[in-house]
Amino acid sequence: MGAAAAEAPLRLPAAPPLAFCCYTSVLLLFAFSLPGSRASNQPPGGGGGSGGDCPGGKGKSINCSELNVRESDVRVCDESSCKYGGVCKEDGDGLKCACQFQCHTNYIPVCGSNGDTYQNECFLRRAACKHQKEITVIARGPCYSDNGSGSGEGEEEGSGAEVHRKHSKCGPCKYKAECDEDAENVGCVCNIDCSGYSFNPVCASDGSSYNNPCFVREASCIKQEQIDIRHLGHCTDTDDTSLLGKKDDGLQYRPDVKDASDQREDVYIGNHMPCPENLNGYCIHGKCEFIYSTQKASCRCESGYTGQHCEKTDFSILYVVPSRQKLTHVLIAAIIGAVQIAIIVAIVMCITRKCPKNNRGRRQKQNLGHFTSDTSSRMV
């Protein structure tokens, strides 16, 4: 019985019926002959050829090649689509309009035809190129006669008169302040949040000490006046003394806009200039700077020094307290570093433990070989 079963031929599975194969082939042919499958196999735009017709709606048809040309024309950068000083430059497979303006930071404000105040005329031209809209200079100086805040490169909000009526209830809100017209007492509101900044005390031009530079900006916004940072660290008793004196009328000279007759390029509000030669050596470990808006000199101390003349050593700079956001990154980096160190230590320990075992095994084998040779010689 076992031999007969072993010699029995293997039986292959029965072939599918002929009718099943015919039905399957018919269904496949019918599926490929549907209009949807034909449309999916054709290239976009229909026709399949370069000169085919594309449906144009309402029974009309247009040439697909003409449609492709029209679509490509939209992406062409030329003089009509890149005006006001723009230059067409290659950007990957296409062209884009680039506004390459190297504007200086001198504060020579101008009022644009869109009602925005720009830092200087170069920023105005750059805004016109960026938005591809004509913006002209309608007045030298800010758009407000009382020196509104102005934007370095603001958005278009209509004409200057419309902007003036829009903020007429609050007046000009400077130093990132916003007008709150819905409040009972309409005025400028400051929404500067300094909660996420670390402790880094500074001395400001108003003679007050602040926990960090963000609070200086907040105070400038609340008081609506220019407040600059003199130096790092707390203010001292001599920080309120003006080095260059005052004008003849006894009032501190705080110009808001550069005089047209003054042609010096380094005269602008809110920036620092090098100190005159008579103040050489004023800063011991730092750089002397003259604040034109306050007519006072200040020192920008080097790292590790503080004081009015940068004569004191600041040991607090060695202990930097990171902010909340940076603290999480520091913790993650510390954990990753600890894991890497642990892996390296584990690998080194495994290698150092494995090597002595191998040496011991080799020594035992050598000793065993000597022992067998000695015993064999004795037996002989």
Curated annotation (Swiss-Prot):
Protein name: Tomoregulin-1
Described function: Neuron-specific restriction factor that prevents herpes simplex virus 1 (HHV-1) infection in the brain by blocking viral entry. Also able to restrict herpes simplex virus 2 (HHV-2) infection, although to a lesser extent. Acts by preventing the association between the viral glycoprotein D (gD) and its cell surface receptor NECTIN1, thereby inhibiting fusion of the virus and the cell membrane. Also able to prevent the association between the viral glycoprotein B (gB) and MYH9/NMMHC-IIA and MYH10/NMMHC-IIB receptors. May be a tumor suppressor in brain cancers.
Extracellular side: 40-330
Site feature: Reactive bond: T105, N106, G196, Y197
Localization, UniProt: Cell membrane
Tagged with keyword Signal: yes
Expression tissues: Expressed predominantly in brain, and at lower levels in heart, placenta and skeletal muscle. Down-regulated in brain tumors as compared to control brain tissues.
Disulfide bond positions: C99-C129, C103-C122, C111-C143, C190-C221, C194-C214, C203-C235, C275-C288, C283-C299, C301-C310
Entry membrane topology: Single-pass type I membrane protein
GO molecular function: receptor ligand inhibitor activity
Topology, Cytoplasmic side: 352-380
A biological process term (GO) from this entry: host-mediated suppression of symbiont invasion
Source species: Homo sapiens (Human)
The encoding gene: TMEFF1
Signal peptide positions on this chain: 1-39
